């Protein structure tokens, strides 16, 4: 059985680049301080991060009763458009949900405001919630499926984001005040 380890993000990103056009199995050998990945003529060795992996199950919300179903590509386009006027420091975008409608709003005293609207699957109580636009784009840009599923509770609780076509893809995003 594989021991619990923490592999540096830089190593994972490098491995992805090296294996981008490859297929087949990748073997991993783990020592107390290092990991080695090998595939055909590729070998990558990295130090492991010293420490205990956090209990991530504690941060995955389980009582989010509001469900938003949205076309992932259209969502990315809307966030990208309205965030063009956000300030670089906060990058806050407000999402307003009501009756199968999602309104995106960004207000910036220096560059004005922007609003966009999208038809979505949402039938729960109205909700206004804010997120960092960069984080929304990073997460929804990773989804392989056509639909993104957001499971929400309220404007101050973590949101669960899922890829409708990949049951293993699970993202937790903390909201921000807007």
Predicted features along the sequence, with ranges:
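Glycine-rich, pocket-lining loop/helix-strand segments that form or immediately flank
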Residues: 52
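Short hinge/gating elements
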Residues: 59-61
């Amino acid at each position: 059985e594989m021991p619990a380890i923490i592999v540096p993000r830089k190593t994972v990103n490098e491995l992805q680049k090296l294996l981008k056009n490859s297929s087949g199995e990748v073997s991993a050998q783990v020592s107390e301080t290092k990991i080695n990945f090998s595939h055909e003529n590729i070998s990558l060795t990295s130090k492991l991060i010293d420490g205990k992996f956090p209990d991530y199950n504690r941060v995955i919300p389980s009582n989010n009763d509001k469900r938003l179903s949205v076309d992932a590509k259209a969502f990315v386009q809307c966030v990208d458009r309205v965030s063009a006027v956000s300030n670089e420091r906060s990058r806050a975008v407000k999402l307003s949900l009501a009756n199968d409608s999602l309104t995106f709003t960004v207000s910036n005293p220096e560059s004005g405001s922007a609003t966009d609207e999208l038809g979505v699957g949402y039938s729960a109580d109205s909700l206004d919630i804010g997120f960092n636009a960069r984080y929304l784009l990073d997460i929804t840009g990773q989804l392989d499926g056509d639909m993104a599923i957001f499971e929400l509770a309220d404007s101050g609780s973590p949101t669960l984001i899922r890829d409708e076509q990949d049951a293993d893809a699970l993202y937790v995003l903390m909201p921000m005040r807007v």
